Amino acid sequence: EMAKPSRKLGFTHASRKGPMIVCLDTSASMYGTPERISSTLIALLEETAEELERDCFLIDFSVSTRAIDLMEKRKAQRLRKLGLTISEEHPSTTHLPFIGGGTSAKKMMKQMFELLDNDGLHYVNADVLWITDFLIPDPPQSMLARFKEYRDTGTRFYGIRIVRDDDKEPNTWKNYFNQIYTIKYRPLRRY
């Protein structure tokens, strides 16, 4: 009688726990309730990234951009709790700054592409999340083509769209993302 093998060989996808790049819209249209929602999301993302041991880089944008390595910020906070100090380029804040003004994705996308291209910063195979209302003017076609190129080569792009519950604006960005989730809110009434 022939012995039956006790195991089967199979193919299983490796779980991807690479870095994350989070692009946060801090334009005037995100003021108020959307700002509070996005601040909460960023705090949850920070905790989740730490639990999953995933590096996380934040780019907040409106007309200008500001980049923050969230994991470095967390490490600095832990060191301060131990009584150790390190010099910081940006002062630590407990909440995200509100920049205000208009919205332009050009600078943010350039910074995002630089992170995705730079092997030394280990964000090459990052997942990208945009937190915005997606009321963003289209950047030049060359940038959109590059966006699509990254997506076609395995970079996953996700969006969280924060809009009023009566929002009827079509989202022109949806074809560039793997998935866009929507959070609807009802504005508070002032009596």
What do the predicted segments below correspond to?
Residues S142-R146, T172:
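A short acidic, amphipathic alpha-helical/loop segment
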Residues E1-M20:
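Negatively charged sequence features
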Residues L52-R54, V124, T153-F157:
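Loop/turn elements at helix/coil->beta-strand transitions in domains of secreted/extracellular proteins
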Residues S15-A126, V128-I131, L135-P139, I160-N171:
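Von Willebrand factor
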Residues T33-E35, P139-S142:
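Conserved ATPase-coupling elements of RecA-like P-loop NTPase cores
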